[in-house]
Amino acid sequence: MEKVKIIGGGLAGSEAAWQLAKRKIPVEIYEMRPVVTTPVHKTEYLAELVCSNSFKSTELTNASGLLKEEMKKLDSLLLRVAEETRVPAGVALAVDRELFAKRVQEILLESPYVTVIREEVKKIPEEGIVIVATGPLTSSDFAEHLIEILDTDSLYFYDAVSPIIYADSINYEKVFSASRYGKGEEAYLNCPMTKEEYERFVEELVNAETVESHYPGEEKFFEGCLPIEVLARRGIDTLRYGPMKPVGLIDPKTGKEPYAVVQLRPENIQKTLYSMVGFQTRLKFQEQRRIFRMIPGLENAEFARYGVMHRNTYFYAPKFLKPTLQFIKNERVFFAGQLIGVEGYMESAAMGIVAGINAARLYKGKPLIILPPTTMIGALISYVTTKVPVKQFQPMNANWGILLPLERPVKDKKLRNRLLAERALRDLDDVIRRFAINV
């Protein structure tokens, strides 16, 4: 019996293996550890957590909570084990990291359909169904292979992501729409600053707390893309001659160029999300919230995701992936996890679930599933498979802004989120029933 090969035994690879094994399809998981190590892994367990031990909120009124509820409906192995190895963390789901990874590995190895092979894979196998889930620390040899089958410009080795803000938390009385020199559509929202506001802002940036790196030598990846706090330390005017330059932008309230400007760019067609242009940062999340709320118009800003800069291997998925997570150039190959441009433990694991389900369906000659963008998992897949300009593509986590909006707008945020969650679970139940996914 031909075996499905999974390259990478992290969160996505483990979930994919579970989905195949439970359907009695033989699987080989290729995990390079401990033969080839990484700077951050401490054990040889599958599904090892290398950063936080938290999987975020479990509440349905939180986007992370909805994502987990959808994963449960699709029989997530990781969430089942997370409940077994849970540690107190309020409404968040946090785990004993070593017990968690150990138990995931035990369950997979107990299956007669799972074999774990401890060796580095340097190329995608030429035959059979394959799921690639090599993660943010993809080995250099396999990364070279990815460059060959993708192209040099489509593979990235670090994240430099600006914060993303919910549109409905912006104070539109203080911002204005305009593109520089009036060229093209008024695509950007502009937050104007006075000299006093700008200088206070820069002072806070200079003295803010930053995140320490998990990865040795990580800073060398960022030489061509400096964090705004580093730019701020180079001189009081550096930012306003860089990402905060006001040239070509006229504030309609004054008829003049502001002293400095923070530009916000739409992140999606619905314009429910805006990113802060040029604001890649390594500030701690609480510092981002505090300091960026000093910007006029962002006093009550709610963040769909915070800015991050860290080591991360991912590719420009919209050019290469179908909504089934199949590789456009070779449909027997699936991709999953952080490699395709999702951000976060559960987001990566969810991609593994879908890749595993669809690999199983391909194996059995059944039609593959595409989850609707009204579901959180479907919306994440839609995000990483919908073409946008290459420079605008950046890893995304679960948030309400990527879901299709409700047919009728709802102003109350809690009610809106609850209605979005109810619709998502209803639509997912419909797909599960129609395709007999859990049978």
Curated annotation (Swiss-Prot):
Catalysed reactions, semicolon-separated: uridine(54) in tRNA + (6R)-5,10-methylene-5,6,7,8-tetrahydrofolate + NADH + H(+) = 5-methyluridine(54) in tRNA + (6S)-5,6,7,8-tetrahydrofolate + NAD(+); uridine(54) in tRNA + (6R)-5,10-methylene-5,6,7,8-tetrahydrofolate + NADPH + H(+) = 5-methyluridine(54) in tRNA + (6S)-5,6,7,8-tetrahydrofolate + NADP(+)
Subcellular localization(s) per the UniProt record: Cytoplasm
GO MF term set: flavin adenine dinucleotide binding; tRNA (uracil(54)-C5)-methyltransferase activity, 5,10-methylenetetrahydrofolate-dependent
Annotated keywords: Cytoplasm, FAD, Flavoprotein, Methyltransferase, NAD, NADP, Transferase, tRNA processing
Enzyme Commission code(s) on record: 2.1.1.74
Cellular compartments per GO CC: cytosol
Requisite cofactors: FAD
Taxonomic superkingdom: Bacteria
Keyword match DNA-binding: no
Residues where FAD binds: G8, G9, G10, L11, A12, G13
Enzyme class at the top of the EC tree: transferase
Main location: cytoplasm
Record Pfam families: GIDA
GO biological process per UniProt: tRNA methylation; tRNA wobble uridine modification
Family note: Belongs to the MnmG family. TrmFO subfamily.
Function of the molecule: Catalyzes the folate-dependent formation of 5-methyl-uridine at position 54 (M-5-U54) in all tRNAs.
Record protein name field: Methylenetetrahydrofolate--tRNA-(uracil-5-)-methyltransferase TrmFO
Species this protein is from: Dictyoglomus thermophilum (strain ATCC 35947 / DSM 3960 / H-6-12)
